[in-house]
Amino acid sequence: MYIKVLGIVLSVFLSTSVNSEVTKEKFILSPSILEIEGDIAYGEYLASDCQTCHRADNSNEGIPGINGREIIEIVYALHEYKNKYRENQVMQMMAGGLGDEEIAALASYFASLQ
């Protein structure tokens, strides 16, 4: 699992555009956070708040669908909102109250949905 996650992180890092005029420092998560195995059942329990805005059918009416996305993508997004690296007040507030285990659980749950 760790090798797969590391490979995904590397590919995301290498595919990041270096030609943009305005660049932020790369957001880095520690390996200990990336190694957390998310509990899908716990993620399902927590997901009701997310599903208020993120539609189950992944339709995008200004709010992206998250079902079926890669675990690493969801983990990074939630940590970026939590740390105010990404801008969106609602997502910053929602992610701000989540712990590492809760983020891993939500990521595992939403990644399991197709």
What are these regions (language model features)?
Residues 7-13:
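Bacterial N-terminal signal peptides
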Residues 15-17:
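N-terminal signal peptide c-region/cleavage motif recognized by signal peptidases
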Residues 21, 25, 77, 96-114:
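C-terminal capping alpha-helices of c-type cytochrome domains
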Residues 21-46:
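Electrostatic cytochrome c docking/interface patches
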Residues 40, 44, 58-86:
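Gly/Gly-Pro-rich "capping" loops immediately C-terminal to redox-active cysteine motifs
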Residues 43, 48-57, 106, 110:
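The canonical Cys-X-X-Cys-His
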Residues 64-69, 93-103:
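Electron-transfer interface patches adjacent to heme c in soluble/periplasmic c-type cytochromes
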Residues 79-100:
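Short Fe-S-cluster ligation motifs
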